[in-house]
């Protein structure tokens, strides 16, 4: 095992406020994505400062849709020059549920649809139960009927992000204050929902 390669900084020197043509519900994102998977972020590969994106190694832990390679390049919006508020650059060990599109047609690089709007962070309860956290609230705002969904208050949120890296935990916490809590989805319920969507 080698020392993980980390991004030079988790935050850019500037903040970018992105405007999106649309927001996605879980079901819309699932249908539109080339691939949907729970992934673990590995080494930082580098950044493209012209397009303000950063590249990371990522490994698929669980695939729900599409034919992702076991290891692929995850492309995140943001770089050392600019990041979106509340959305630090990933780091080695970050676990995510992502709704992905092929970035450049190579089948090796993928980016989340509309970037952070379709990125859910993986968090765990005390018993080791796995949940997916919508820290920006944009997916859950479109999706009031998805099973297994709960809204956490700040104390519950602090508990469930205690093992998350401190930069991300702090970003999630400040985001939750802006949105009056964060929604989480239970893994088992979302997996059942995905298998129903896949049959449609």
Task: Please provide the spans of the model-predicted regions.
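OB-fold (S1/OB) nucleic-acid-binding surfaces
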Residues: 50-78
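Solvent-exposed loop/turn segments at secondary-structure junctions
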Residues: 44-48, 63-66, 79-82, 103-107, ...
């Amino acid at each position: 095992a080698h020392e993980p390669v980390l991004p030079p900084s988790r935050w850019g020197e500037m903040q970018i406020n992105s405007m999106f043509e649309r927001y996605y519900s879980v079901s819309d994102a699932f249908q539109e994505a080339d691939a949907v998977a729970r992934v673990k972020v590995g080494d930082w590969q580098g950044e493209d400062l012209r397009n303000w994106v950063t590249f990371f190694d990522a490994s698929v832990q669980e695939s729900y849709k599409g034919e992702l390679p076991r290891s692929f390049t995850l492309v995140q919006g943001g770089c050392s020059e600019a990041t979106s508020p509340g959305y630090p650059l990933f780091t080695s060990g970050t676990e995510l549920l992502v709704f992905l599109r092929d970035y450049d047609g190579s089948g090796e690089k993928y980016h989340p649809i509309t970037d952070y709007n379709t990125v859910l962070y993986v968090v765990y309860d005390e018993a080791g139960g796995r949940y997916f956290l919508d820290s920006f609230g944009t997916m859950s705002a479109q999706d009031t009927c998805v099973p297994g969904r709960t809204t956490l208050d700040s104390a519950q949120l602090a508990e469930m992000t205690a093992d998350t890296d401190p930069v991300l935990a702090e970003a999630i916490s400040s985001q939750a204050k802006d949105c009056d809590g964060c929604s989480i989805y239970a893994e088992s319920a979302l997996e059942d929902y995905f298998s129903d969507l896949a049959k449609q």
